[in-house]
C-alpha cells in the first residue's frame, strides 16, 4: 500500500519536516564534512558532521550557551551570538585539523543576512574553507551588533521602553550601546583559544 500508481508515502523524516533527502545526498556526495547550523528563538547550534553508514558522526560542535561560559552577556539568539558561535566552531575545527566543509542549511530558506549565514561567516573568519556567495552574508555592522547599539540609542529617550526592551542586558551588567565592543572582546578571546 505504501507505493502504487496513485499514492506514495514519503519517508518519515520528510513527512515530519526534518530532512530534505535530495539536498542531503548532494551534500554527502561532496565528500566533505557538513557545517550544520540551526537556530531557535534563544539559541544557536553549530556542528561539523561527517557521514557514517551507522549514522552521522559529530566532529566538532558549538552552542551559544558556551559563549555565556566565556563571558558573553548578550542575548544568545541574536546575530552577533550566531557569528560568535560560528567563530567558536571554526576555532575548534581548525584545532582538530578540519579545515573544509559545506554548509547544510537544512529546510531553512536562504535569506540574506540570516543567522545561519552569520554562523558561516564566523567559521570563515576562524580559518575554515567553505564555499559560499558573498552577497548572502550580513553586513559587518549587523554581525558585531551595531544595529542593536543604534536601536538602543534611539530608544534611550523613553526610559521605560528602554528598560523594558533591554532588561536582560542591563540585568547582566551590559549596556546595549557597548555590545559591538563586547563582541570584539569575545572575538579576540575565541581566536586566542
From Swiss-Prot:
Pfam families: Ribosomal_L5e
UniProt entry tagged with the keyword Transport: no
GO process terms (BP): ribosomal large subunit assembly; translation
GO molecular function, one term: 5S rRNA binding
Entry GO CC: cytosolic large ribosomal subunit
Coiled coil: none
Gene3D superfamilies: 3.30.420.100
Transcription regulation as UniProt keyword: no
Entry keyword set: Ribonucleoprotein, Ribosomal protein, RNA-binding, rRNA-binding
TM region(s), chain numbering: none
Top-level lineage group: Archaea
Purpose: This is one of the proteins that bind and probably mediate the attachment of the 5S RNA into the large ribosomal subunit, where it forms part of the central protuberance.
Self-association and partners: Part of the 50S ribosomal subunit. Contacts the 5S and 23S rRNAs.
Alphabetized HAMAP family for the sequence: Ribosomal_uL18_A
Family: Belongs to the universal ribosomal protein uL18 family.
Entry protein name: Large ribosomal subunit protein uL18
Annotated source species: Methanococcus maripaludis (strain DSM 14266 / JCM 13030 / NBRC 101832 / S2 / LL)
Amino acid at each position: 500500500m505504501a507505493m502504487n500508481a496513485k499514492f506514495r508515502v514519503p519517508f518519515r523524516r520528510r513527512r515530519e519536516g526534518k530532512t530534505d533527502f535530495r539536498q542531503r545526498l548532494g551534500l554527502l556526495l561532496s565528500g566533505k564534512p557538513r557545517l550544520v547550523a540551526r537556530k531557535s528563538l534563544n539559541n544557536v547550534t553549530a556542528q561539523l558532521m561527517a557521514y557514517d553508514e551507522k549514522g552521522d558522526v559529530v566532529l566538532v560542535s558549538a552552542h551559544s550557551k558556551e559563549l555565556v561560559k566565556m563571558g558573553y552577556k548578550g542575548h544568545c539568539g541574536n546575530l552577533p551570538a550566531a557569528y560568535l558561535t560560528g567563530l567558536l566552531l571554526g576555532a575548534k575545527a581548525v584545532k582538530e585539523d578540519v579545515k573544509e566543509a559545506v554548509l547544510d542549511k537544512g529546510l531553512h530558506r536562504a535569506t540574506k543576512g540570516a543567522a545561519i549565514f552569520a554562523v558561516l561567516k564566523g567559521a570563515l573568519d576562524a580559518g575554515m574553507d567553505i564555499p559560499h556567495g558573498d552577497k548572502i552574508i550580513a553586513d559587518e555592522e549587523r554581525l558585531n551588533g551595531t544595529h542593536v547599539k543604534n536601536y538602543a540609542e534611539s530608544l534611550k529617550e523613553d526610559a521605560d521602553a528602554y528598560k523594558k526592551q533591554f532588561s536582560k542586558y542591563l540585568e547582566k551588567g551590559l549596556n546595549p550601546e557597548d555590545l559591538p565592543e563586547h563582541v570584539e572582546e569575545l572575538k579576540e578571546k575565541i581566536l586566542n583559544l
